[in-house]
Amino acid sequence: MAKKPTRGGVDRGVDPWPLGQRPGFLVRRLHQIHVALFQEKCAEFEITPLQYSLLSALAVRGTADQTTLAADVALDRTTTTGALKRLHARRFIERAVRRDDRRARACRLTAMGAALLSRMETAARAAHRDTLASLSKSDQKRFIALMQQIVAADGFRA
């Protein structure tokens, strides 16, 4: 039986569980690594990974309300709205009150936003590629599939 850690000679009553074996810790570290790579590769554009995701979602959807975009990028509406306001201030998106629902705002890419997204694409893809660079191509595909499986099964939690 593994010896239980003690502090000041007091038995803590738990077996050690190294951080490097904890899924939550590893996911957080991988996220930190990816954000650092994204910022390194995309620094010239002054866009965060979240803003890039929102621009990408709008490129696919054309027009979408803020609630839909929040769901697309798996964030709460408040955080999403703040990011959209910053993109709007830089003229990368348009936000307008919807005619059918005065409480909702419809968003769409501007020509500037579409051009930015196009210019960023190579650098952003390089950040994603470099995040998984230590894995073989087959392991990269397997890793993505495993992450998709976990998100599909438990995505409702957040």
Model segments located where?
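N-terminal leader segment of winged-helix/HTH proteins
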Residues: 1-45
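Short, locally clustered residues in the helix-turn-helix/winged-helix DNA-binding domain
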Residues: 28-31, 56-60, 121, 148
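Pre-recognition alpha-helix immediately N-terminal to the DNA-recognition helix
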Residues: 26, 33, 53-56, 115, ...
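Charged, amphipathic alpha-helical coiled-coil/dimerization segments
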Residues: 3-6, 35, 63, 85-148
